[in-house]
Amino acid sequence: MQIRNVYGIDLGTSTVKIYDLKKDTITKEKNMIAIRNREQVIAVGNYAYEMHERTPSNIEVITPMSNGRIANVLMVEAVLHTLLHRCTRHMGYRPELYFSVPCDMTEIERRSYYTIAHKGALKNCRMYLVDKPIADALALGIFQNIQCHRYICAGIDINM
């Protein structure tokens, strides 16, 4: 039985996918957030998507990601924490979060993922960034029958 809580997270431009290893479930919701007067969060995920283009002028429904990149750190943080709370009520002690990220990210973009993950209830979490091609290969089961070898090449640690 799995004791620790492990989550795989894909913050896509249009959808957020969260895999819970303990429950073996995938939560898939729209990556949208509804905000009143630019400060109060009203709805997140599919609830915000249902409000899209049907809201009064003081309520904005936005996508906090743009072209696979974080456009608004505070809004992505609100989306992530709300959807993780919907996924599981109790995160446990030091949950592990694996984020699927683009390969060509800058250090500033990488830092924004760390900023998002270490807020609120997740401040004691272990967080890892996994390149999208590697995450896709793992999801397809390509690496299941490969023995692990570690190569250190020019100061770069490569796991194969």
Regions found by a protein language model. Give the residues of each.
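Nucleotide/phosphate-binding catalytic cleft detector across ATP-hydrolyzing
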Residues: 1-29, 34-42, 46-154, 158
